[in-house]
A protein has these predicted regions:
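Active-site recognition of the HExxH zinc-binding catalytic motif
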Residues: 63-75
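Short pre-active-site segment immediately N-terminal to the catalytic Zn-binding motif
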Residues: 43-64, 79-80
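A short, highly charged nucleic-acid-interacting micro-segment common to nuclease
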Residues: 2-6, 83-86
Length: 107
């Protein structure tokens, strides 16, 4: 099994969620040591290069990107309650990330 792209290359610079453009960027760090942050109305996802004093690995950055996408999807469908349920978002993200990486490893 092989991967043609590195994991960090899988993170796009821009996505759309519910027809809204979302800019994606990797920043040095985020307040409070978060790995990532997103804002649907603000149209952005920010992924920290360093979180809580540690450099995030590429796999962690990909997981953070998907995690923030899940938050945005829930907010977009009007379910902020689901977006605020961090345990649900983490569980969903873990499964989605594993599926994506499994698909990539088969190509």
């Amino acid at each position: 099994m092989k991967q043609n792209k590195s994991l960090i290359d899988l993170i796009p610079n821009k996505i759309q969620v519910g027809g809204q453009d979302i800019d994606v960027s990797i920043v040095d760090s985020i307040e409070d040591g978060y790995c990532g942050i997103s804002q649907l109305c603000g149209g952005y996802i920010k992924i920290a290069d360093k979180a809580n004093g540690y450099i995030q690995s590429d796999s962690s950055k990909l997981n953070t990107f998907i995690h923030e996408c899940v938050h945005l999807i829930f907010r977009n469908i009007g379910r902020s309650d689901l977006s605020d349920d961090e345990a649900l978002v983490v569980a969903f993200t873990g499964s989605a990330t594993e599926i994506i990486r499994s698909i990539l490893n088969q190509k």
